[in-house]
Protein backbone atom coordinates (compact mmCIF):
# COMPACT_ATOMS: atom_id res chain seq x y z
CA UNK A 1 0.00 0.00 0.00
CA UNK A 2 2.85 2.40 0.89
CA UNK A 3 4.44 1.72 -2.49
CA UNK A 4 1.12 2.37 -4.23
CA UNK A 5 0.67 5.75 -2.44
CA UNK A 6 4.27 6.72 -3.14
CA UNK A 7 3.90 5.76 -6.80
CA UNK A 8 0.78 7.91 -7.23
CA UNK A 9 2.48 10.84 -5.46
CA UNK A 10 5.52 10.46 -7.69
CA UNK A 11 3.37 10.31 -10.78
CA UNK A 12 1.62 13.58 -9.84
CA UNK A 13 5.03 15.23 -9.66
CA UNK A 14 6.07 13.80 -13.03
CA UNK A 15 2.83 14.89 -14.69
CA UNK A 16 3.60 18.50 -13.77
CA UNK A 17 6.84 18.42 -15.72
CA UNK A 18 6.80 20.08 -19.11
CA UNK A 19 10.49 20.04 -19.99
CA UNK A 20 11.95 18.00 -22.84
CA UNK A 21 14.01 15.93 -20.42
CA UNK A 22 12.36 13.33 -18.22
CA UNK A 23 13.55 13.26 -14.62
CA UNK A 24 14.33 9.89 -12.99
CA UNK A 25 11.36 8.18 -11.31
CA UNK A 26 13.23 7.39 -8.08
CA UNK A 27 14.49 4.25 -9.82
CA UNK A 28 11.07 2.58 -9.82
CA UNK A 29 11.21 -0.36 -12.20
CA UNK A 30 8.50 -1.29 -14.68
CA UNK A 31 7.42 -4.20 -12.53
CA UNK A 32 7.23 -2.03 -9.39
CA UNK A 33 4.98 0.44 -11.20
CA UNK A 34 2.80 -2.40 -12.50
CA UNK A 35 2.58 -4.07 -9.09
CA UNK A 36 1.50 -0.78 -7.48
CA UNK A 37 -1.54 -0.53 -9.75
CA UNK A 38 -4.93 -1.63 -8.40
CA UNK A 39 -6.47 -3.35 -11.39
CA UNK A 40 -10.07 -3.06 -12.56
CA UNK A 41 -12.00 -6.32 -12.81
CA UNK A 42 -11.90 -7.55 -16.40
CA UNK A 43 -15.72 -7.45 -16.52
CA UNK A 44 -15.57 -3.64 -16.24
CA UNK A 45 -12.96 -3.44 -19.00
CA UNK A 46 -15.19 -5.57 -21.25
CA UNK A 47 -18.14 -3.29 -20.48
CA UNK A 48 -16.14 -0.33 -21.80
CA UNK A 49 -16.14 -2.16 -25.13
CA UNK A 50 -19.85 -2.90 -24.93
CA UNK A 51 -19.22 -6.59 -24.24
CA UNK A 52 -21.43 -8.34 -21.68
CA UNK A 53 -20.05 -10.50 -18.89
CA UNK A 54 -21.70 -13.55 -20.45
CA UNK A 55 -19.70 -13.01 -23.64
CA UNK A 56 -16.25 -13.26 -22.09
CA UNK A 57 -14.34 -16.29 -20.86
CA UNK A 58 -12.49 -15.20 -17.72
CA UNK A 59 -9.01 -16.35 -16.76
CA UNK A 60 -9.14 -15.09 -13.18
CA UNK A 61 -10.11 -11.49 -12.37
CA UNK A 62 -7.93 -9.62 -14.84
CA UNK A 63 -7.72 -11.64 -18.07
CA UNK A 64 -10.36 -12.92 -20.45
CA UNK A 65 -10.87 -14.47 -23.86
CA UNK A 66 -13.15 -12.77 -26.40
CA UNK A 67 -15.35 -15.06 -28.57
CA UNK A 68 -14.98 -14.75 -32.34
CA UNK A 69 -18.70 -14.18 -32.92
CA UNK A 70 -18.24 -10.60 -31.70
CA UNK A 71 -16.31 -9.65 -34.86
CA UNK A 72 -18.34 -7.48 -37.27
CA UNK A 73 -16.66 -6.80 -40.63
CA UNK A 74 -18.89 -3.78 -41.31
CA UNK A 75 -17.61 -2.10 -38.15
CA UNK A 76 -14.05 -3.16 -38.98
CA UNK A 77 -14.27 -1.25 -42.27
CA UNK A 78 -15.65 1.91 -40.63
CA UNK A 79 -13.22 2.32 -37.74
CA UNK A 80 -9.66 3.63 -37.68
CA UNK A 81 -6.48 1.55 -37.68
CA UNK A 82 -3.17 3.13 -36.62
CA UNK A 83 0.11 1.23 -37.01
CA UNK A 84 3.11 1.92 -34.77
CA UNK A 85 6.55 1.01 -36.12
CA UNK A 86 10.08 2.34 -35.71
CA UNK A 87 13.40 3.23 -37.24
CA UNK A 88 16.09 0.52 -37.31
CA UNK A 89 16.47 -0.32 -33.60
CA UNK A 90 19.33 -0.76 -31.20
CA UNK A 91 19.45 -4.16 -29.43
CA UNK A 92 17.38 -2.85 -26.49
CA UNK A 93 14.53 -1.70 -28.75
CA UNK A 94 13.16 1.82 -29.12
CA UNK A 95 9.84 1.54 -27.28
CA UNK A 96 7.18 0.75 -29.90
CA UNK A 97 5.03 -1.08 -27.37
CA UNK A 98 5.42 1.72 -24.82
CA UNK A 99 4.46 4.31 -27.45
CA UNK A 100 1.54 2.17 -28.67
CA UNK A 101 0.12 1.92 -25.16
CA UNK A 102 0.85 5.57 -24.38
CA UNK A 103 -0.79 6.69 -27.61
CA UNK A 104 -3.89 4.66 -26.74
CA UNK A 105 -4.03 6.37 -23.34
CA UNK A 106 -3.59 9.76 -25.03
CA UNK A 107 -6.35 9.10 -27.57
CA UNK A 108 -8.76 8.21 -24.78
CA UNK A 109 -7.74 11.35 -22.88
CA UNK A 110 -8.68 13.55 -25.86
CA UNK A 111 -12.07 11.86 -26.18
CA UNK A 112 -11.44 9.10 -28.71
CA UNK A 113 -12.51 5.55 -27.94
CA UNK A 114 -9.27 3.63 -28.44
CA UNK A 115 -7.99 0.11 -27.80
CA UNK A 116 -4.40 -1.07 -28.09
CA UNK A 117 -3.92 -4.40 -29.89
CA UNK A 118 -0.54 -6.04 -29.34
CA UNK A 119 1.43 -9.25 -29.73
CA UNK A 120 2.05 -11.65 -26.87
CA UNK A 121 5.60 -11.69 -25.48
CA UNK A 122 7.92 -14.65 -26.03
CA UNK A 123 9.86 -16.15 -23.13
CA UNK A 124 13.04 -16.12 -25.23
CA UNK A 125 13.52 -12.33 -25.17
CA UNK A 126 12.00 -12.06 -21.67
CA UNK A 127 14.87 -14.12 -20.25
CA UNK A 128 17.36 -13.04 -22.92
CA UNK A 129 18.34 -9.47 -23.74
CA UNK A 130 15.33 -7.51 -24.99
CA UNK A 131 12.97 -8.09 -22.08
CA UNK A 132 9.21 -8.43 -22.16
CA UNK A 133 6.62 -6.76 -24.33
CA UNK A 134 4.19 -5.16 -21.91
CA UNK A 135 5.41 -1.59 -22.36
CA UNK A 136 7.33 0.45 -19.82
CA UNK A 137 7.04 3.11 -17.14
CA UNK A 138 3.50 4.50 -16.99
CA UNK A 139 2.57 3.08 -20.39
CA UNK A 140 2.08 -0.60 -19.63
CA UNK A 141 -0.47 -3.34 -20.04
CA UNK A 142 -1.30 -5.32 -16.92
CA UNK A 143 -1.16 -7.81 -15.23
CA UNK A 144 2.41 -7.37 -16.45
CA UNK A 145 3.92 -10.54 -14.95
CA UNK A 146 1.18 -12.77 -16.36
CA UNK A 147 1.38 -11.21 -19.82
CA UNK A 148 5.17 -11.57 -19.99
CA UNK A 149 5.16 -15.16 -18.73
CA UNK A 150 2.58 -17.88 -19.50
CA UNK A 151 -0.42 -15.52 -19.94
CA UNK A 152 -3.45 -17.58 -21.09
CA UNK A 153 -1.42 -20.46 -22.50
CA UNK A 154 -1.59 -19.51 -26.19
CA UNK A 155 2.14 -20.03 -26.80
CA UNK A 156 1.97 -23.40 -25.09
CA UNK A 157 -0.91 -24.41 -27.35
CA UNK A 158 1.00 -23.32 -30.47
CA UNK A 159 4.07 -25.24 -29.30
CA UNK A 160 2.07 -28.39 -28.59
CA UNK A 161 0.22 -28.25 -31.92
CA UNK A 162 3.52 -27.80 -33.76
CA UNK A 163 5.21 -30.65 -31.92
CA UNK A 164 2.20 -32.94 -32.29
CA UNK A 165 2.74 -32.72 -36.04
CA UNK A 166 6.44 -33.53 -35.54
CA UNK A 167 5.51 -36.59 -33.49
CA UNK A 168 3.00 -37.72 -36.13
CA UNK A 169 5.63 -37.38 -38.86
CA UNK A 170 8.16 -39.54 -37.02
CA UNK A 171 5.48 -42.03 -35.99
CA UNK A 172 4.45 -42.40 -39.63
CA UNK A 173 8.04 -43.04 -40.70
CA UNK A 174 8.37 -45.68 -37.94
CA UNK A 175 5.08 -47.38 -38.91
CA UNK A 176 5.84 -50.27 -41.27
CA UNK A 177 2.29 -51.16 -42.27
CA UNK A 178 0.52 -47.83 -42.71
CA UNK A 179 2.95 -45.11 -43.71
CA UNK A 180 3.10 -42.43 -46.38
CA UNK A 181 6.60 -43.46 -47.48
CA UNK A 182 8.01 -40.09 -46.38
CA UNK A 183 11.66 -39.55 -47.24
CA UNK A 184 13.21 -38.34 -43.93
CA UNK A 185 15.89 -36.42 -45.83
CA UNK A 186 13.25 -34.08 -47.26
CA UNK A 187 11.37 -33.21 -44.07
CA UNK A 188 11.21 -29.44 -43.63
CA UNK A 189 9.11 -29.35 -40.46
CA UNK A 190 10.95 -28.57 -37.22
CA UNK A 191 10.05 -28.82 -33.58
CA UNK A 192 9.70 -25.61 -31.52
CA UNK A 193 10.25 -24.37 -27.98
CA UNK A 194 9.63 -20.89 -26.57
CA UNK A 195 13.17 -20.32 -25.37
CA UNK A 196 16.44 -18.97 -26.76
CA UNK A 197 18.45 -22.21 -26.97
CA UNK A 198 21.14 -22.35 -29.64
CA UNK A 199 22.07 -25.95 -28.72
CA UNK A 200 18.78 -27.13 -30.27
CA UNK A 201 19.30 -25.59 -33.72
CA UNK A 202 20.60 -28.82 -35.24
CA UNK A 203 20.05 -32.16 -33.53
CA UNK A 204 19.85 -35.85 -34.38
CA UNK A 205 16.77 -37.76 -33.22
CA UNK A 206 15.76 -41.41 -33.19
CA UNK A 207 18.96 -42.71 -31.59
CA UNK A 208 19.11 -45.64 -29.19
CA UNK A 209 17.82 -48.50 -31.28
CA UNK A 210 14.87 -49.40 -33.48
CA UNK A 211 12.30 -48.89 -30.73
CA UNK A 212 13.18 -45.18 -30.55
CA UNK A 213 12.32 -44.25 -34.11
CA UNK A 214 14.23 -43.71 -37.33
CA UNK A 215 17.40 -41.63 -36.88
CA UNK A 216 17.34 -38.39 -38.81
CA UNK A 217 18.58 -34.84 -38.65
CA UNK A 218 16.14 -32.40 -37.05
CA UNK A 219 16.19 -29.10 -35.19
CA UNK A 220 14.19 -26.58 -33.18
CA UNK A 221 12.92 -23.12 -34.04
CA UNK A 222 11.69 -20.70 -31.40
CA UNK A 223 7.89 -20.84 -31.02
CA UNK A 224 7.24 -17.36 -32.53
CA UNK A 225 8.87 -18.65 -35.74
CA UNK A 226 6.54 -21.67 -35.95
CA UNK A 227 4.28 -21.84 -38.97
CA UNK A 228 1.49 -22.71 -36.53
CA UNK A 229 1.99 -19.26 -34.98
CA UNK A 230 1.92 -17.71 -38.45
CA UNK A 231 -1.28 -19.61 -39.26
CA UNK A 232 -2.90 -18.50 -35.99
CA UNK A 233 -2.09 -14.91 -36.93
CA UNK A 234 -3.37 -15.22 -40.52
CA UNK A 235 -6.55 -17.22 -39.83
CA UNK A 236 -9.88 -15.48 -40.41
CA UNK A 237 -12.04 -17.95 -38.44
CA UNK A 238 -11.80 -21.41 -36.90
CA UNK A 239 -12.60 -23.27 -40.12
CA UNK A 240 -9.94 -21.26 -41.95
CA UNK A 241 -7.48 -22.10 -39.16
CA UNK A 242 -8.17 -25.81 -39.58
CA UNK A 243 -7.80 -25.68 -43.37
CA UNK A 244 -4.50 -23.82 -43.08
CA UNK A 245 -3.18 -26.39 -40.61
CA UNK A 246 -3.98 -29.12 -43.12
CA UNK A 247 -2.13 -27.19 -45.84
CA UNK A 248 1.21 -27.26 -43.98
CA UNK A 249 3.87 -28.64 -46.34
CA UNK A 250 6.04 -31.26 -44.67
CA UNK A 251 8.33 -32.72 -47.34
CA UNK A 252 8.32 -35.40 -50.04
CA UNK A 253 7.82 -39.14 -50.37
CA UNK A 254 10.48 -41.39 -51.85
CA UNK A 255 8.45 -41.07 -55.07
CA UNK A 256 9.00 -37.27 -54.91
CA UNK A 257 5.35 -36.52 -54.17
CA UNK A 258 4.57 -33.66 -51.76
CA UNK A 259 3.29 -34.48 -48.28
CA UNK A 260 1.01 -32.17 -46.30
CA UNK A 261 -0.27 -32.25 -42.72
CA UNK A 262 -3.70 -33.27 -44.01
CA UNK A 263 -2.14 -36.46 -45.41
CA UNK A 264 -1.35 -37.40 -41.81
CA UNK A 265 -4.89 -36.42 -40.75
CA UNK A 266 -3.24 -33.97 -38.36
CA UNK A 267 -5.30 -30.82 -38.82
CA UNK A 268 -8.21 -31.69 -36.53
CA UNK A 269 -6.02 -32.78 -33.64
CA UNK A 270 -3.87 -29.66 -34.05
CA UNK A 271 -6.99 -27.48 -34.16
CA UNK A 272 -8.28 -29.11 -30.97
CA UNK A 273 -5.13 -27.94 -29.21
CA UNK A 274 -5.73 -24.41 -30.55
CA UNK A 275 -9.47 -24.18 -29.83
CA UNK A 276 -8.97 -21.61 -27.06
CA UNK A 277 -5.76 -20.07 -28.38
CA UNK A 278 -7.64 -18.82 -31.44
CA UNK A 279 -9.64 -16.40 -29.26
CA UNK A 280 -8.09 -12.96 -28.59
CA UNK A 281 -7.12 -12.03 -25.02
CA UNK A 282 -8.50 -8.98 -23.20
CA UNK A 283 -6.52 -7.17 -20.48
CA UNK A 284 -6.10 -3.49 -19.51
CA UNK A 285 -3.65 -0.60 -19.53
CA UNK A 286 -2.46 1.21 -16.41
CA UNK A 287 -5.15 3.83 -17.10
CA UNK A 288 -7.83 1.12 -17.34
CA UNK A 289 -8.30 1.27 -21.09
CA UNK A 290 -8.88 -1.97 -23.04
CA UNK A 291 -5.94 -3.91 -24.43
CA UNK A 292 -6.24 -6.93 -26.73
CA UNK A 293 -3.14 -9.12 -26.90
CA UNK A 294 -2.97 -12.10 -29.24
CA UNK A 295 -0.36 -14.00 -31.23
CA UNK A 296 3.36 -13.38 -31.12
CA UNK A 297 5.50 -13.91 -34.24
CA UNK A 298 8.84 -12.08 -34.40
CA UNK A 299 9.28 -9.62 -37.27
CA UNK A 300 12.81 -10.63 -38.26
CA UNK A 301 12.12 -14.38 -38.66
CA UNK A 302 8.31 -14.33 -39.08
CA UNK A 303 5.60 -11.80 -39.98
CA UNK A 304 5.84 -9.78 -36.75
CA UNK A 305 2.20 -8.80 -36.26
CA UNK A 306 -0.63 -9.84 -33.95
CA UNK A 307 -3.52 -11.92 -35.26
CA UNK A 308 -5.96 -10.74 -37.90
CA UNK A 309 -8.72 -11.83 -35.50
CA UNK A 310 -7.39 -9.58 -32.70
CA UNK A 311 -7.10 -6.56 -34.99
CA UNK A 312 -10.61 -7.11 -36.32
CA UNK A 313 -11.91 -7.61 -32.78
CA UNK A 314 -10.42 -4.28 -31.76
CA UNK A 315 -11.83 -2.52 -34.82
CA UNK A 316 -15.26 -4.02 -34.12
CA UNK A 317 -15.32 -2.75 -30.54
CA UNK A 318 -13.46 0.59 -30.79
CA UNK A 319 -13.34 3.66 -33.01
CA UNK A 320 -9.54 3.66 -32.91
CA UNK A 321 -7.18 0.69 -32.79
CA UNK A 322 -3.49 1.25 -32.14
CA UNK A 323 -1.35 -1.74 -33.10
CA UNK A 324 2.35 -2.38 -33.60
CA UNK A 325 4.61 -4.42 -35.84
CA UNK A 326 7.98 -5.72 -34.72
CA UNK A 327 11.46 -4.23 -35.09
CA UNK A 328 12.01 -1.51 -37.72
CA UNK A 329 9.59 -0.49 -40.45
CA UNK A 330 11.66 -2.44 -43.00
CA UNK A 331 10.53 -5.64 -41.25
CA UNK A 332 7.32 -5.47 -39.20
CA UNK A 333 5.62 -2.61 -41.02
CA UNK A 334 6.55 -3.96 -44.46
CA UNK A 335 4.96 -7.30 -43.55
CA UNK A 336 1.97 -5.69 -41.85
CA UNK A 337 1.25 -3.71 -45.01
CA UNK A 338 2.21 -6.21 -47.72
CA UNK A 339 0.94 -9.38 -46.02
CA UNK A 340 -1.56 -8.84 -43.20
CA UNK A 341 -3.37 -5.73 -44.45
CA UNK A 342 -3.41 -6.93 -48.05
CA UNK A 343 -4.87 -10.33 -47.16
CA UNK A 344 -7.33 -9.15 -44.48
CA UNK A 345 -8.38 -6.06 -46.47
CA UNK A 346 -7.43 -3.72 -43.63
CA UNK A 347 -6.81 -0.03 -44.32
CA UNK A 348 -4.32 1.53 -41.89
CA UNK A 349 -4.91 5.28 -41.93
CA UNK A 350 -1.77 6.47 -40.16
CA UNK A 351 1.67 5.09 -39.33
CA UNK A 352 3.52 6.28 -36.24
CA UNK A 353 7.29 5.99 -36.66
CA UNK A 354 9.00 5.72 -33.29
CA UNK A 355 12.45 7.29 -33.12
CA UNK A 356 14.84 7.73 -30.24
CA UNK A 357 17.78 10.08 -29.97
CA UNK A 358 19.76 7.07 -28.74
CA UNK A 359 19.11 5.12 -31.96
CA UNK A 360 19.93 8.15 -34.11
CA UNK A 361 23.27 8.49 -32.31
CA UNK A 362 23.86 4.79 -32.98
CA UNK A 363 23.17 5.18 -36.70
CA UNK A 364 25.48 8.19 -36.66
CA UNK A 365 28.35 5.92 -35.67
CA UNK A 366 28.39 6.26 -31.87
CA UNK A 367 29.51 3.18 -29.93
CA UNK A 368 27.25 1.56 -27.33
CA UNK A 369 29.09 3.01 -24.34
CA UNK A 370 28.33 6.54 -25.63
CA UNK A 371 24.64 5.99 -26.52
CA UNK A 372 23.55 8.19 -23.63
CA UNK A 373 25.94 11.07 -24.31
CA UNK A 374 24.53 14.02 -26.30
CA UNK A 375 26.07 14.18 -29.78
CA UNK A 376 24.30 16.45 -32.25
CA UNK A 377 26.66 15.56 -35.10
CA UNK A 378 25.91 11.85 -34.69
CA UNK A 379 22.16 12.53 -34.55
CA UNK A 380 22.48 14.54 -37.75
CA UNK A 381 24.35 11.71 -39.48
CA UNK A 382 21.97 9.08 -38.12
CA UNK A 383 18.85 10.93 -39.27
CA UNK A 384 19.27 9.42 -42.75
CA UNK A 385 18.06 6.09 -41.31
CA UNK A 386 14.82 7.67 -40.10
CA UNK A 387 14.46 9.54 -43.38
CA UNK A 388 14.59 6.27 -45.36
CA UNK A 389 11.84 4.79 -43.17
CA UNK A 390 9.72 7.92 -43.76
CA UNK A 391 10.19 7.50 -47.51
CA UNK A 392 9.22 3.83 -47.28
CA UNK A 393 5.97 4.49 -45.41
CA UNK A 394 4.97 7.05 -48.02
CA UNK A 395 5.48 4.42 -50.73
CA UNK A 396 2.44 2.66 -49.25
CA UNK A 397 0.42 5.86 -49.70
CA UNK A 398 0.27 6.49 -45.94
CA UNK A 399 1.36 9.64 -44.16
CA UNK A 400 3.58 9.03 -41.11
CA UNK A 401 3.86 10.83 -37.80
CA UNK A 402 7.22 10.64 -36.02
CA UNK A 403 7.06 9.98 -32.26
CA UNK A 404 10.31 10.85 -30.49
CA UNK A 405 10.27 8.47 -27.55
CA UNK A 406 11.83 10.61 -24.84
CA UNK A 407 14.82 9.54 -22.73
CA UNK A 408 16.52 11.43 -19.90
CA UNK A 409 19.77 11.54 -21.91
CA UNK A 410 18.17 13.49 -24.79
CA UNK A 411 19.33 17.08 -25.17
CA UNK A 412 16.98 19.86 -26.24
CA UNK A 413 19.26 20.59 -29.21
CA UNK A 414 19.03 17.01 -30.47
CA UNK A 415 15.26 16.82 -30.06
CA UNK A 416 14.71 20.18 -31.76
CA UNK A 417 16.99 19.14 -34.61
CA UNK A 418 14.91 16.01 -35.28
CA UNK A 419 11.64 17.94 -35.12
CA UNK A 420 12.94 20.57 -37.55
CA UNK A 421 14.35 17.97 -39.96
CA UNK A 422 11.04 16.10 -39.97
CA UNK A 423 9.14 19.35 -40.52
CA UNK A 424 11.38 20.09 -43.52
CA UNK A 425 10.19 16.76 -44.98
CA UNK A 426 6.55 17.68 -44.34
CA UNK A 427 6.29 15.22 -41.44
CA UNK A 428 4.83 16.09 -38.06
CA UNK A 429 7.25 15.04 -35.28
CA UNK A 430 6.07 14.99 -31.66
CA UNK A 431 7.82 14.30 -28.38
CA UNK A 432 6.25 11.22 -26.76
CA UNK A 433 6.47 11.13 -22.95
CA UNK A 434 4.20 8.19 -22.24
CA UNK A 435 6.88 6.33 -20.31
CA UNK A 436 6.97 9.01 -17.60
CA UNK A 437 3.51 10.54 -17.86
CA UNK A 438 1.17 7.96 -19.35
CA UNK A 439 -1.64 9.47 -21.43
CA UNK A 440 -0.83 13.00 -20.26
CA UNK A 441 2.50 12.68 -22.03
CA UNK A 442 1.04 11.57 -25.36
CA UNK A 443 -1.90 13.91 -25.92
CA UNK A 444 0.00 15.93 -28.53
CA UNK A 445 0.94 12.73 -30.33
CA UNK A 446 -2.70 11.62 -30.19
CA UNK A 447 -3.82 14.94 -31.71
CA UNK A 448 -1.27 14.59 -34.53
CA UNK A 449 -2.53 11.07 -35.28
CA UNK A 450 -6.18 12.15 -35.26
CA UNK A 451 -5.33 14.99 -37.66
CA UNK A 452 -3.89 12.48 -40.15
CA UNK A 453 -6.72 9.97 -39.69
CA UNK A 454 -9.58 12.46 -39.94
CA UNK A 455 -8.17 14.96 -42.43
CA UNK A 456 -5.41 13.37 -44.52
CA UNK A 457 -5.98 9.61 -44.65
CA UNK A 458 -5.96 7.90 -48.06
CA UNK A 459 -6.40 4.32 -49.23
CA UNK A 460 -3.14 2.53 -48.55
CA UNK A 461 -1.65 0.35 -51.29
CA UNK A 462 0.74 -2.61 -50.96
CA UNK A 463 4.04 -2.52 -52.84
CA UNK A 464 3.49 -5.72 -54.81
CA UNK A 465 0.77 -7.97 -56.15
CA UNK A 466 0.86 -11.45 -54.60
CA UNK A 467 0.39 -12.91 -58.09
CA UNK A 468 3.64 -11.40 -59.36
CA UNK A 469 6.63 -13.73 -59.93
CA UNK A 470 8.42 -14.74 -56.72
CA UNK A 471 11.74 -13.14 -57.64
CA UNK A 472 9.97 -9.91 -58.61
CA UNK A 473 8.29 -9.74 -55.20
CA UNK A 474 11.57 -10.42 -53.38
CA UNK A 475 13.41 -7.81 -55.41
CA UNK A 476 10.67 -5.22 -54.89
CA UNK A 477 11.13 -5.50 -51.13
CA UNK A 478 14.92 -5.60 -51.32
CA UNK A 479 15.25 -2.61 -53.63
CA UNK A 480 12.28 -0.43 -52.67
CA UNK A 481 12.29 -1.00 -48.90
CA UNK A 482 15.86 -1.96 -48.05
CA UNK A 483 17.53 0.17 -50.72
CA UNK A 484 19.55 -2.74 -52.15
CA UNK A 485 21.17 -2.45 -55.55
CA UNK A 486 21.13 -6.17 -56.34
CA UNK A 487 19.70 -9.48 -55.13
CA UNK A 488 21.70 -12.70 -55.43
CA UNK A 489 20.34 -16.23 -55.01
CA UNK A 490 22.45 -19.10 -53.67
CA UNK A 491 22.31 -22.49 -55.38
CA UNK A 492 20.03 -23.68 -52.58
CA UNK A 493 17.70 -20.72 -53.11
CA UNK A 494 17.57 -21.44 -56.84
CA UNK A 495 16.61 -25.05 -56.07
CA UNK A 496 13.95 -23.75 -53.69
CA UNK A 497 12.53 -21.49 -56.43
CA UNK A 498 12.16 -24.47 -58.76
CA UNK A 499 10.45 -26.46 -56.00
CA UNK A 500 8.07 -23.55 -55.29
CA UNK A 501 7.17 -23.37 -58.97
CA UNK A 502 6.58 -27.11 -59.18
CA UNK A 503 4.30 -27.06 -56.12
CA UNK A 504 2.29 -24.11 -57.44
CA UNK A 505 3.11 -21.75 -54.57
CA UNK A 506 4.13 -18.78 -56.71
CA UNK A 507 1.13 -16.69 -55.57
CA UNK A 508 2.15 -16.65 -51.91
CA UNK A 509 3.21 -13.48 -50.10
CA UNK A 510 6.87 -12.88 -49.23
CA UNK A 511 7.93 -12.92 -45.57
CA UNK A 512 11.61 -11.99 -45.44
CA UNK A 513 13.87 -13.32 -42.66
CA UNK A 514 16.53 -10.64 -42.21
CA UNK A 515 18.60 -9.03 -39.50
CA UNK A 516 16.75 -6.29 -37.64
CA UNK A 517 19.97 -4.32 -37.14
CA UNK A 518 20.36 -2.99 -40.67
CA UNK A 519 18.43 -2.23 -43.85
CA UNK A 520 20.79 -4.74 -45.46
CA UNK A 521 21.45 -8.41 -44.65
CA UNK A 522 24.71 -7.37 -42.96
CA UNK A 523 24.12 -6.15 -39.40
CA UNK A 524 27.31 -4.07 -39.51
CA UNK A 525 25.87 -1.72 -42.17
CA UNK A 526 24.08 0.81 -39.98
CA UNK A 527 22.51 4.12 -40.99
CA UNK A 528 21.31 4.15 -44.59
CA UNK A 529 23.58 1.83 -46.58
CA UNK A 530 23.61 2.12 -50.36
CA UNK A 531 24.92 0.08 -53.27
CA UNK A 532 24.74 -3.21 -51.37
CA UNK A 533 23.66 -6.68 -52.50
CA UNK A 534 21.41 -8.93 -50.44
CA UNK A 535 21.89 -12.69 -50.66
CA UNK A 536 18.95 -15.07 -50.48
CA UNK A 537 20.45 -18.13 -48.79
CA UNK A 538 17.34 -20.31 -49.01
CA UNK A 539 13.57 -19.98 -49.27
CA UNK A 540 11.34 -21.81 -46.82
CA UNK A 541 7.73 -22.65 -47.61
CA UNK A 542 4.87 -21.85 -45.21
CA UNK A 543 2.00 -23.21 -47.29
CA UNK A 544 -0.53 -23.03 -44.46
CA UNK A 545 0.27 -19.39 -43.78
CA UNK A 546 0.44 -18.79 -47.54
CA UNK A 547 3.80 -17.13 -47.62
CA UNK A 548 7.36 -17.87 -48.66
CA UNK A 549 10.26 -17.11 -46.34
CA UNK A 550 13.46 -15.99 -48.10
CA UNK A 551 16.26 -16.23 -45.54
CA UNK A 552 18.80 -13.47 -46.07
CA UNK A 553 22.40 -13.64 -44.92
CA UNK A 554 23.12 -15.44 -41.65
CA UNK A 555 19.65 -15.29 -40.09
CA UNK A 556 18.66 -18.17 -37.80
CA UNK A 557 15.18 -19.03 -36.57
CA UNK A 558 16.37 -20.18 -33.16
CA UNK A 559 18.09 -17.37 -31.21
CA UNK A 560 20.69 -17.87 -28.48
CA UNK A 561 21.02 -16.25 -25.08
CA UNK A 562 23.48 -13.37 -24.53
CA UNK A 563 26.52 -13.65 -22.26
CA UNK A 564 24.56 -12.06 -19.41
CA UNK A 565 20.89 -13.02 -19.87
CA UNK A 566 18.16 -10.98 -18.20
CA UNK A 567 17.23 -14.05 -16.17
CA UNK A 568 20.29 -13.45 -13.97
CA UNK A 569 18.71 -10.29 -12.57
CA UNK A 570 15.34 -11.82 -11.69
CA UNK A 571 14.18 -12.91 -8.24
CA UNK A 572 11.01 -14.22 -6.63
CA UNK A 573 10.32 -14.17 -2.89
CA UNK A 574 8.45 -16.62 -0.68
CA UNK A 575 5.20 -14.73 -1.33
CA UNK A 576 5.55 -15.08 -5.09
CA UNK A 577 6.48 -11.42 -5.66
CA UNK A 578 8.71 -11.12 -8.73
CA UNK A 579 11.40 -8.49 -9.27
CA UNK A 580 13.77 -7.86 -12.17
CA UNK A 581 11.20 -8.68 -14.86
CA UNK A 582 10.88 -5.95 -17.48
Annotate each PLM feature.
Residues 22-582:
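Flexible phosphate-sensing "switch/lid" loops adjacent to ATP/NTP-binding sites
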Residues 9-15, 114, 318:
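Generic secretory/membrane-interface signal
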Residues 9-12, 19-21, 576:
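Charged/polar low-complexity intrinsically disordered segments
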Residues 14-18, 194-195:
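Intrinsically disordered, low-complexity serine/threonine-rich segments
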Amino acid sequence: MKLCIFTRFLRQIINKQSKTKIEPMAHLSDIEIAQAKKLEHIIKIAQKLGVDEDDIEMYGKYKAKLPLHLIDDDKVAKNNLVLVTALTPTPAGEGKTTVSIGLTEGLNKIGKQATVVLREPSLGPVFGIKGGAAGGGYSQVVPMEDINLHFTGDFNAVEKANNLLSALIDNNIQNKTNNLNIDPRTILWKRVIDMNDRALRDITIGLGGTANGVPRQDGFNITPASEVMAILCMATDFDNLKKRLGDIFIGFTYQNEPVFARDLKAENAMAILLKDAVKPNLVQTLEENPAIIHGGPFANIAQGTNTILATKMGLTLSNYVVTEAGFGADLGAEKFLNIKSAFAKLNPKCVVLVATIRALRHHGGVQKEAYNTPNLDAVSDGFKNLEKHIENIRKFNIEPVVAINSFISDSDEEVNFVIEKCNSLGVHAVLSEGWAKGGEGTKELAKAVVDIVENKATQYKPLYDWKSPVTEKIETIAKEVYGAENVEYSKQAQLNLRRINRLGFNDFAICMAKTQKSFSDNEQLIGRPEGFTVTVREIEIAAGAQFLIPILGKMMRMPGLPESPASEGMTIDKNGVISGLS
